[in-house]
Regions:
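Acyl-thioester-processing domains in fatty-acid/polyketide/NRPS systems
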Residues: 1-294
Length: 294
């Protein structure tokens, strides 16, 4: 996600990177109504990568106050240049980077390019690993579960973002198991990541299935209050990986991702969604209702 970078006293780190949906699976496989759209989780990854440019010795411990303000669309499958800004300031024993992702383009009636801010957030950087958090590894479902084919019969995600292998209800939570193996989501495929964006995506989709099953509506990401990552483990979790999402208020979810040993490798608190107009397709409703309504 990092292209050319400049540093200044007033603007901090500013990165310009050009992305092409023809080349990048995370765009080609993330289309809404046929148009590639930058996944919110890759915007978060861009924040993390930009924030660490000035303090590469520190780890990304979390990202707070993420706002998905406007989608980044790649019309006609054409490449676009993104501008990622990170202003890094001391914060206790670490640093905080105030980040934004924007684009510039010419619009009718204007003589100069107009800037749109799409995403904002704050990256938390530190040397000390967070205290280990344990969670319960979900048991195998005893009630109906949705298969990947059923999930992606109505979810718009292409192969690289089909992160749900199966999903079911457990009490008052939505549970999903991570697809294994995942196919490459970026080019080059071995380019390092900071925050395991597809584990965050697993949380988004797990919460979305709960809403779709109970409310008959699809929803898109709107905000994340707090996201926490275990450095190292989040990028290489052990064994079978599950996401467990709990709705704590209408359209507001907390979610954890646990590995096979029960370690919480990713935690999202206060993930908020915005519903799309129109109901879930009728063909998918029966499987959703059988799984999540009881």
């Amino acid at each position: 996600m990092i292209g050319t970078a400049t540093v200044s006293v007033h603007e901090g780190v500013v990165v310009h990177t050009t992305l092409d949906p023809v080349q990048q699976p995370f765009l080609d496989h993330h289309r809404i109504d046929g148009t590639p759209v930058l996944p919110g989780v890759m915007g978060m990854e861009a924040f993390a990568e930009a924030a660490t440019l000035l303090v590469p010795e520190l780890s990304v411990l979390g990202i707070d106050d993420v706002e998905f303000l406007a989608p980044v669309k790649f019309f006609r499958d054409e490449a676009r240049t993104l501008r990622v800004q990170a202003v890094v300031v001391p914060d206790g024993d670490g640093f905080v980077a105030r980040c934004s992702l924007s684009t510039d383009r010419m619009l009718p009636g204007h003589e100069t390019p107009q800037r749109t801010v799409h995403f904002t957030g704050r990256v938390l950087l530190g040397a000390a690993a967070p205290e280990a958090e344990r969670g319960d590894v979900p048991a195998a479902p005893t009630s109906p579960a949705m298969s990947a084919d059923e999930v992606y019969s109505f979810y718009f995600h292409g192969p690289a973002y089909r992160v749900v292998a199966a999903a079911w209800r457990s009490g008052d939570t939505s549970v999903a198991v991570l697809t294994d193996p995942l196919i490459p989501d970026r080019e080059p495929p071995d380019r390092p990541l900071c925050i395991a964006p597809r584990l965050v995506e697993l949380c988004f989709q797990t919460a979305g299935l709960w809403q779709a099953g109970l409310e008959d509506r699809l929803a898109l990401p709107m905000a994340v209050e707090h996201a926490r990552f275990v450095p190292g483990r989040a990028l290489d979790p052990a064994g079978v990986v599950h996401a467990i999402a709990t709705e704590r208020a209408p359209g507001v979810f907390d979610c954890v991702v646990v590995d096979a040993e029960g370690e919480v490798v990713v935690r999202l608190d206060g993930y908020r969604t915005i519903p799309l107009p129109g109901p879930v397709p009728a063909a998918a409703a029966s499987a959703l209702h059988a799984t999540f309504r009881r």
